[in-house]
Amino acid sequence: MLLTEEDKQFIAEEERLLESTLQSLCQQLPQVQAAKISANAAARELTRQVVNEWNHEERQPLVSDEAVAHHILDIRKNSDKALYELIQEPYFGRVCTKEEDGSEVSFLIGKKSNIEAGIVDWRNGPIAGLYFNYKQEEEFYEVINERERAGYIQLRRSYQIENGQLVQIDAPEGMFRRNEAGWERLDVEDEIVAHRSRGMGSKEKRLPNILSLITKDQFELITSNPERPVIIQGSAGSGKTTVALHRLAWLLHEENSFAQAKNTRVVVMNKSLQIYVCATLPSMGIEGVETSTFNGWALSIIRKAVRGRPFFKFLNVPSFVEEIKFSEEILKALEGWVEKQNRALDAQVKEIFKKWPGLLKSWTKTNNTAVLPRLKDFAHDVKESSLPKYDKDQCLAFLNRKSFDMEDYVQDVYNLLHDSGHLKGYLPPNPKLDSHLDYLKRLTEKNRAKNNLDYFDMSLVLRLIQLKNGGLPDGTGGVTSLDHLVIDEAQDFGPVEFAIMMSAVSDKRQITIVGDVAQKILSARKFIGWNKVVENLGMEEDSIIRLEVSFRCTAPIMTLAHKVAGDPKKVEGRAGPDPEWHKAEDRESLLEKLVDWTHSLVKADPYKLIALICRYPKQAMELKEELKEYLPGEVRLGHRDQFSFEPGIMVTNIHQVKGLEFDSVALIEPDEENYPIRREESRNMIYVGITRTQDDLLLTTVKPFSRVFFYN
């Protein structure tokens, strides 16, 4: 739509505001850089003095001064970095208030604060709340800096600024967007498109910034109470992970909570999502937080806690084996197994130490302590006791043997899975249970003989370590007690993994959980269910954050996704091309279609990130090799840590793309063979594949399409 003179004046005013803000930030640079150089010189000089000072009494105050100087240098370095980041994107919102006494105050809302430029960090709850909690012309009442403030919101606007340039303004007066020809006023449908926070031609491929789109209720849940667990449900592309990470960013900001970045963790389902999230965290002001896959985290602990080097192998096993190992019953069987060992140990200790009532009393009073620290503490008591040397040596040898046996977690898992009688006491009745347990017993014998472990055994080993140590060992003799934990794609974790993660936090309220059951693709891992999660956390169900609007996908794509998910309905949202269905005559024509399709997309926008998604990793590798002839040097493989989110064409498989997003997606061979309708996860896997795209979707196959597309 053409701009009126009033529109032009409106935009010019906003451009002047940005220019003056950038000018203020740039004027601060020389001062900050000079302070950094000065701090660096001071730190180096003090280090030189410490090195050259041999007198201990003279050296001590120098050491203290040096530590302070280096801390100041770190602050100066961060100030320098923060300024450069603000110059790229100084703010995303503005709010002006008129208070009851007639005074007017204006704030810019950004990802970081800068007092001189008038920018307030969005994590500064009371002030930022004026932007998030109110609309233009609404009355407000807030307590800010221990002072009651009331009035009304005179002005509220949202912005998109990229590389120091204003590209979008969203206000009650209308939405305006900059294009190659200049500024334009958007109509209603184009406004929906513009709410995507990544514009056309953007090289930035990471989780989008949705801060300006967060609702009042969502802001309240994210920022109001650091002691409350947060659960976020939502459809694909609705910003679940982004909202969760903003919750974490708020918790880590200054004095919003006690959480420290170094003692906080984000756990995701796959390696590619880990890379994606790691690339996003710095842009949200989150530094020093460990992001890992669950298996990566588990392995890092297991390799330190387990003797030797356990070898976990992907084994092709019947689904009932996987279901047993990821069931809620196996979790109880593990606890029962450790309890049985504890009872046997307790009986032995009582028999051996009955001659020494004082030591036996010392053992008995630690009855509620986990077995390994209990043995360690008791061994210390025995060592410090007045027992005769021979008796003391014999008792300590016994306790050391018991500790050694208790720490043999791998043999423990073998023994547990081999003990059909024990398992039968926990698993639900089933006509085939005996034959299933016989098979599991034989499989375990083979694994023990080869010193192999199934990848599905990893969680069992880790849970045993946790139960016997009273927590996950932290490598320094203590146990992990996280300040906060974010769990993404929660629906694909089973009861054992959930128990491990929930027990790893200092307080079960210090947790943020994200998920969508429609995207569950690991069917054997039975999700404990949102009702149980809510119950375990002591929450009310109505306190769950639900995000229903997809900011990623177009309406035609989400309409197809809902149909695949078994919930057919017409979806409102931004417009876009219909999904393209291509039934190829043979493999060669399928490849030719992919080449033509990708070429047309890249020609229209050379910065597009295009994903060609196969069902299995082997299929992805084969497709990449086939496309080499047609697209030499243009196609790369996306697999685990080989993922790159630079623009271009990526071939990958469905399990790698959970939680990710691309500009365009081609689903390769979504046929009945790859996605049989009889398998529960087929529907969810196709849903995941479809909803990875922002704009373009191609479905291409030689064989008939999977019946999942046509039957609810």
PLM region spans:
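P-loop NTPase Walker
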Residues: 1-35, 40-41, 169, 175, ...
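Conserved acidic
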Residues: 206, 436, 681
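Extended, charged low-complexity regulatory segments
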Residues: 1-211, 215, 219-220, 706-707
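Conserved helicase motor core of SF1/SF2 NTP-dependent helicases
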Residues: 257-258, 262, 271-275, 279, ...
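Generic detector of solvent-exposed, compositionally biased contiguous segments
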Residues: 54-75, 220-235, 239-250, 396-444, ...
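Short, charged/polar micro-motifs that form catalytic or ligand-binding hotspots
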Residues: 81, 85, 200, 204, ...
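Phosphate/oxyanion-binding active-site loops and adjacent basic polyanion-contact surfaces
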Residues: 206, 210, 240-244, 453-457, ...
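Alpha-helical nucleic-acid-binding subdomain
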Residues: 128, 133, 252-487, 491-509, ...
